[in-house]
Amino acid sequence: LLPLTQAKLPFVPLNDFAPVGQVSRLPYFLAVSATQPYKSAKDLLADPKARDGALAYASNGIGSMAHIGTEMLIQRAGAKMIHVPYNGFTPAIADLVTGRTVMVMADLAPLNAQLQDGKLRPLAVASEKRSPFLPDVPTLAEAGYPGTEFEVWLALYAPAKTPRAVVDKLSAELNKVLANPATREAFVRLGHEADYAAPDAVRKRIQAEQSAFAPAVRAAGLAAQTN
């Protein structure tokens, strides 16, 4: 997303780097305080208060994936909410629990303790499919908001001029490593899902996400200024 928010990057991602393969995905969940009445994403986003700017959502910082992804969801849901950025998820979730904000989009690691204690309620996962970490939580598409998927994902890259034969060999080895049960379990402990994707799929994903996120970046006032 950097090309969308920063005008003077010292590199052009898809020109200066060659994708080797996707490594893992980190799903994001929409969560609210358990004291809130909302039982689904639609309950929240269709609430009249969520449409007139009376509700606030938290993020771990301006320009973060949580910020931009939530703006995309709100925009496509026809809602209007106040953004309250925090310096990380820890204070954001603390205020969410106490009711200072109404929702947050975050990965499982900062949410897990409060979910286990029953202080937070997960309403949806922003991935294309349900997460094995919380399989009973529906996707945003299932909740009535298709096209709002987002997540943090990791990929391996090589310099742009790396011969394709070398890239393909590295990609094949990456696929083997990620298929190893021990490797997959190690990612689970980090809250990630090991999920290989080929170089061309990574390139297409970058292009698709830049197009999908551009309106949300503009709506959040984060679009790169060229002058």
Predicted regions and their residues:
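An extracytoplasmic/periplasmic, membrane-proximal ligand-sensing/linker region
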Residues: Q75-R76, T139-E142, R164-N227
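Short secondary-structure boundary segments
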Residues: A34, D107-A109, S127-E128, A160
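Conserved functional loop/turn residues at catalytic and ligand-binding sites
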Residues: S40, P85, G99-R100, D107, ...
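Hinge/capping helix and adjacent helix->loop/strand transition within the periplasmic-binding protein
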Residues: L4-P91, L140, W153-A186
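Short helices/loops that flank or line small-molecule/ion binding pockets
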Residues: E71-R76, T90-V104, A109-D117, I206-E209
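Paired acidic/hydrophobic, glycine-rich loop segments that form the ligand-binding mouth/hinge
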Residues: A56, V102-D107, P122-A124, F213-P215
